[in-house]
């Protein structure tokens, strides 16, 4: 079942075309990594998928899923890292957009606690978010995204700024969500080797070339060979 279909998609940023005639689809249970050099339009594409930025032409179609069933984990900013709230408050805020209520209820709190437990950070629920390590903060934000996600997780550079141990732990969590719970994942990544290791499909965006297909097909392409040096 296809959850997302993009056809002949063109998008611009600050009046500059960054995506041109991009076509791909995401099926239920896919783990799609979006890779490519800086400025290739990866984050712009994310905004298009989330409905935050309209395409200049082409289509973005969601099927069997609404915008309130998508969890989003953006790149962290300095302001976010210093956010003055408890872990539970940060996570439970993820339920607000899904329920369209201004305030959370007992069910929302239960959902937040379940996701904290799922990511093995329930013991941190009363800690101040800004006091946590980078890896712990990213788990908290992922738990927040899961409060909104019932079918699809969209992640923008989820491992950015994390140490190698935290990166490995986060990829393990994402693999469990994808394989054991059939959560569909779309992730922008600057780390092509990790993308190849963890994804079943790759969308490579480039200024001159683009690729969409299965990971095993991607690693046979000239694009992959050129970037990795044939590793």
Where are these regions (language model features)?
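Conserved ABC ATPase signature
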Residues: 128-132, 136
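Catalytic Walker B motif of ABC-type/P-loop ATPase nucleotide-binding domains
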Residues: 153-156
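H-loop (His-switch) and adjacent beta-strand-loop-beta switch element
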Residues: 201-214
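Conserved ABC ATPase "signature" region
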Residues: 106-124
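H-loop/switch region of ABC-family ATPase nucleotide-binding domains
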Residues: 189-190
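Conserved ABC transporter NBD signature motif
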Residues: 58-70
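The feature captures the beta-strand-to-loop junction immediately N-terminal to the Walker
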Residues: 35-37
């Amino acid at each position: 079942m296809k959850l997302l279909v993009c056809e002949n998609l063109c998008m611009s940023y600050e009046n500059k075309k960054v995506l041109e005639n991009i076509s791909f689809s995401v099926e239920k249970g896919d783990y799609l990594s979006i890779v490519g050099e800086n400025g290739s339009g990866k984050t712009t594409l994310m905004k298009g998928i989330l409905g935050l930025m309209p395409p200049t032409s082409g289509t973005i179609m969601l099927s069997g899923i609404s915008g309130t069933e998508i969890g989003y984990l953006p790149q962290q900013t300095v302001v976010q890292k210093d956010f003055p709230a408890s872990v539970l408050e940060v996570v439970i805020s993820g339920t607000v957009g899904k329920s369209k209520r201004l305030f959370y209820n007992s069910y929302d709190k239960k959902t937040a606690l379940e996701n904290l437990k799922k990511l093995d950070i329930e013991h941190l629920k009363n800690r101040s978010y800004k006091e946590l390590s980078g890896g712990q903060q990213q788990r908290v934000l992922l738990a927040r995204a899961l409060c909104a996600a019932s079918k699809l997780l969209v992640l923008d550079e989820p491992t950015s700024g994390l140490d190698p141990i935290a990166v490995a732990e986060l990829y393990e969590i994402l693999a469990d969500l994808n394989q054991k719970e059939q959560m569909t994942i779309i992730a922008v990544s600057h780390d092509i080797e990790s993308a190849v290791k963890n994804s079943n499909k790759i969308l490579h965006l480039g200024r001159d070339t683009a690729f969409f297909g299965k990971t095993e097909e991607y690693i046979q392409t000239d694009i992959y060979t050129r970037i990795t040096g044939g590793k």
